[in-house]
Design a protein with these regions (language model features):
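Short, well-ordered, aromatic-rich surface patches in folded extracellular/luminal domains
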Residues: 2-7, 13-55, 117-183
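A mature extracytoplasmic/lumenal domain signature
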Residues: 78-80, 104, 137-139
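A signal for specific C-terminal beta-sheet/loop modules enriched in small/flexible residues
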Residues: 86-106, 155-163
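Residue-level signal for well-ordered alpha-helical segments
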Residues: 27, 42-44, 77, 81-86, ...
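Short, surface-exposed linear patches
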Residues: 68-70, 112-114, 155-158
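Short, internal acidic amphipathic alpha-helical interface segments
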Residues: 95-129
Length: 183
């Protein structure tokens, strides 16, 4: 008799769990966007990359702007293996970096769709540009990685034109450096 009562209670418990899951749905916890406002005094860096259309390695280029609390840099690479064509660095102060990070936060730099199906930008918008928005730890690993394209694809939810211009203005002669790069 005791077995029947235990079995009955387990069955009722399972029914309640199934009903709760159906009503509330099964979902993974929502990841909160990073708060960059506290990162100006750390080794955290932010990076914006323009990945040109898919083409022969000899004509493919990336423009990478990296900003940290001591310097900003622009790297032009050729091909798909990160071969550096040019690199220029500029001094950055903690105060300037603090304001820059705040501007990025206001314009949604850390907002994106975390759907795993959208995690990898490679191959998307093959004939257009891919824009990659990253927050990097002091060791260089991705803390956050979002992307958009000229084909209106991607998982980045921030203000694309403002974010791009904010990064470009961290490089004093951005226009002359990138003028001859075919994107």
């Amino acid at each position: 008799m005791a077995r029947y009562i235990v079995g009955f209670l387990l069955a009722i418990g399972l029914i309640i769990i199934v009903i709760v899951l159906i009503v509330h749905g099964v979902s993974s916890p929502t990841r909160q966007p990073l708060n960059l406002n506290n990162d100006a005094n750390t080794n955290t860096e932010v990076q914006f990359t323009i990945d040109s259309p898919i083409s022969a390695a000899s004509t493919h280029h990336d423009i990478i702007v990296n900003v940290g609390n001591t310097q900003s840099s622009i790297v032009i690479t050729q091909g798909y293996d990160g071969q550096i064509d040019s690199l220029q660095t500029y001094p950055m102060s903690v105060n300037a970096y603090t304001i820059f990070l705040r501007a990025l936060m206001i314009n949604g730099f850390t907002l994106g769709n975390n759907n795993p199906a959208l995690a990898d930008e490679r191959g998307h918008c093959a004939l257009g540009d891919r824009f990659i928005y990253e927050v990097l730890s002091g060791s260089g690993s991705d803390l956050e990685h979002y992307w958009s394209t000229t084909c209106n694809l991607g998982n980045f939810l921030g203000n694309i034109p403002v974010i791009q211009q904010l990064f470009e203005t961290q490089i004093p002669n951005y226009g002359s450096i990138t003028n001859n790069i075919a994107l």
